[in-house]
Amino acid sequence: MRVARELVDVEIDDETRLVFTDHDAPGIADALAVVLRSPARFVGVMGSRRHVGPYVDELRAKGFGDEDLARIRSPLGLDLGGRSPAEIALSIAAGLVADEHDRAAGWLDR
């Protein structure tokens, strides 16, 4: 709940990208509810669909619809095949850069 309270004071506009990196943190569903009511451009939660699913269910019970819930990206990052923390961070950063430029991301044709 603390994260949700703090997010209320953050100016979130249509260029804001928010990434939740701890899918086990208390209050994630409440924080996501705050963000989904905003015009944030990108909302991501690190973790598998299995980990994030309970938050989606909780948000649905709070009245959020499919269109709202589709804004939540999870798992995060591009599929670069990496497993180390550095590689995962790179894949998330690359995904955010691709989003910045409205690109699907992939190899450039030669």
Residue ranges and their predicted role:
Residues 4-14:
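Short amphipathic alpha-helix with an adjacent loop that forms part of the alpha/beta core around
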Residues 25-29:
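Cytosolic regulatory regions of ion transport systems
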Residues 75, 98-110:
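A short, charged, Gly/Pro-tolerant segment at domain boundaries
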Residues 48, 67-97:
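Active-site capping/gating segments
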Residues 20-22:
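Short, well-ordered coil/turn residues at beta-beta hairpins
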Residues 14, 57, 61-72:
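Short acidic, glycine/proline-enriched helix-loop-strand junctions
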Residues 17, 33-59:
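ADP-ribose/adenylate-binding Rossmann-like module
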